[in-house]
């Protein structure tokens, strides 16, 4: 069984603490991040990360269903762009991607860790309550970009369990066997 979801939004911010913008698609650069995004440029709020922590900040995801759930607890609703995550998803539980290989559009990624909420989304959006409403599993996840390619609104997200190489797109089997 292959678990699937869909990309519902793609967002970039050129600098730390600047508003994110919604884009129809973005180019994922292996080992770096999304072209034009603050973390790919090394100017994100947490770009000082080193070693293993650097890999976990290449791209971030948030689940549309968790935004809707969190908004039940806020006075002013948060939109996906307000969360400061790069990709809004629908139809897949993001915590299932931790420790898994998965594809998004043309890319292969590896889910690294949960994306703990901080105060920056509230500070940038001017909307109170992000830290509290998006606590725990609602904050989304971070991932490492293993192969570059395009990510777009409407792209499919698929989980690949190690050992199920026959489901991988051409060329990915060799990558997975490294």
Question: Where in this protein do the model-derived segments appear?
Answer:
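Electropositive, beta-rich accessory/interaction domains or terminal extensions
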Residues: 1-104, 108-113, 150, 160-178
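Short, structured beta-strand/loop micro-motifs enriched in basic residues and often containing a Trp
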Residues: 82-91, 133-144
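Flexible glycine-rich active-site/ligand-binding loops centered on an Asp-His dyad
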Residues: 111-142, 164-178
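Glycine- and charge-enriched low-complexity intrinsically disordered segments
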Residues: 137-163
């Amino acid at each position: 069984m292959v678990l699937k979801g869909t990309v519902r939004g793609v967002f970039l911010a050129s600098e730390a603490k600047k508003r994110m913008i919604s884009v129809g698609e973005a180019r994922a650069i292996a080992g770096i991040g999304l072209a034009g995004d603050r973390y790919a440029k090394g100017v994100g709020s947490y770009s000082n990360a080193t070693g293993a922590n650097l890999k976990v900040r290449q791209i971030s995801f948030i689940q549309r269903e968790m935004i809707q759930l969190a908004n039940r607890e806020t006075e002013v609703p948060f939109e996906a762009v307000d969360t400061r995550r790069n990709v809004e998803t629908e139809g897949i539980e993001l915590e299932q991607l931790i420790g898994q290989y998965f594809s998004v559009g043309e890319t292969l990624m590896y889910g690294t860790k949960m994306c703990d909420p901080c105060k920056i989304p509230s500070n940038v959006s001017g909307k109170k309550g992000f830290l509290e409403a998006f606590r725990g599993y609602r904050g989304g996840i971070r991932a490492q970009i293993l192969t570059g390619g395009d990510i777009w609104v409407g792209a499919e997200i698929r989980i690949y369990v190690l050992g199920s190489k026959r489901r991988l797109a051409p060329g990915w089997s060799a990558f997975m066997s490294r």
